[in-house]
Curated annotation (Swiss-Prot):
The lineage of its organism: Bacteria, Pseudomonadati, Campylobacterota, Epsilonproteobacteria, Campylobacterales. GO terms for biological process: bacterial-type flagellum-dependent cell motility. It holds the Pfam family FlgI. Assembles around the rod to form the L-ring and probably protects the motor/basal body from shearing forces during rotation. Coiled coil: none annotated. This is Flagellar P-ring protein.
Length: 342
């Protein structure tokens, strides 16, 4: 026990040199959220609810009234103050009976707005068909741009718990959020160095099986494991939001020399110095841009995604055009990184 904590103190003292904690890059298999869903009614709407043409809404109103001993045919209901909605929620791990969770409500009929209404008691089911929570509450005006959906903070009460016996377990499995052979071995070796050999074994690039040392309970063991710093190798990734034009990438993602054409735009990327001084603009990091010939030079240095984006902005390329060029760079092999388009 003493050796473990001394090692942890030593590592944590140099945490600035390390990228992540194991708990940040890996999750415990089986310890996860469970999705809940339910169908219900929002009442008290000021004429903005579903119209009588929404047969399922009128039938639901009839069923609700019948449950309180009021019998009326769905065909006789003409109310516009009620809207049919779907309710979704996430049941967190280890949630206990009586705990509150947030819910999200969305209209499924032809209502104009559900703002200002009240969700009547609605059971929320999991995929196994069991009821795990009951939702109910007033809908407070939130997003003025979307009147047909809303959130209710603490809008549901947990009625059934997901049983999970963590205390008596001797072995668990860690799942890396981003599978990587190097990271899996790194986690394995780090845990074995801290707790002793054969505590951890990497089964594949994503999965590490860990066995609890006898001197710890599983809760204590996992608490220690999640706090251990580790050198984390992340894949290069570029995220592009085409609508807003936002581009997120690592600062050191390099772009190899290439000529790329997309739509009406041609961009030449080179390490050679530029000759046309009249049309050359100096950018950051020793880069230069020939605006007449759309040529970007790094003057012998490495060119990064950040430099390419800045050059495209100088040329006046639209957000959509930037996305096209970045995709073309990826396809040509000039970029060694994953790309995600939002």
């Amino acid at each position: 026990m003493k050796r473990v904590f001394l090692w942890l103190i030593f590592v944590l003292a140099f945490h600035k040199l390390l990228a992540e904690k194991i708990g940040d890059i890996a999750s415990v298999v089986g310890v996860r959220d469970n999705q809940l869903i339910g169908y219900g009614l929002v009442i008290g709407l000021n004429g903005t609810g579903d119209k009588s043409g929404s047969k399922f809404t009128m039938q639901s109103i009839s069923n609700m009234l019948e449950s309180v001993n009021v019998k009326i045919s769905a065909d006789d209901i003409k109310s516009k103050n009620v809207a049919a909605v779907m309710i979704t929620a996430s049941l967190p791990p280890f949630a206990r009976q009586g705990d509150k969770i947030d819910i999200h409500i969305s209209s499924i009929g032809d209502a104009k707005s559900i703002q200002g209404g009240t969700l009547v008691m609605t059971p929320l089911n999991a995929v196994d068909g069991n009821i795990y929570a009951l939702a109910q509450g007033a809908i407070v005006s939130g997003n003025s741009n979307n009147l047909l959906s809303a959130n209710i903070i603490n809008g549901a009460t947990i009625e059934r718990e997901v049983s999970y016996d963590l205390f008596h377990k001797n072995a668990m499995t860690l799942s890396l959020k981003n599978p990587n052979f190097k990271n899996a071995i790194q986690v394995q070796n780090t845990l074995n160095k801290v707790f002793g050999n054969k505590v951890a074994i990497a089964l594949d690039p994503k999965t590490i099986q860990i066995t609890r040392p006898e001197r710890f309970s599983m809760v204590e063991f996992l608490a220690l494991v999640q706090e251990i710093p580790i050198n984390y190798s992340a894949k290069n990734k570029i995220i592009v939001d085409e609508k807003s034009g936002t581009i997120v990438s690592g600062v050191d993602i390099m772009v190899h020399p290439v000529v790329v054409t997309s739509q009406d735009i041609t961009l030449k990327i080179t390490k050679d110095p530029l000759n046309d001084s009249k049309n050359t603009q100096d950018l950051d990091n020793n880069m230069s841009l020939d605006t007449a010939h759309n040529t970007l030079s790094s003057n012998g240095k490495n060119i990064t995604i950040a430099g390419v984006v800045k050059a495209l902005q100088k040329i006046g390329v639209s957000a959509k055009g930037m996305v096209s060029i970045l995709q073309a760079l990826k396809k040509s092999g000039a970029i060694s990184a994953e790309m995600e388009i939002l």
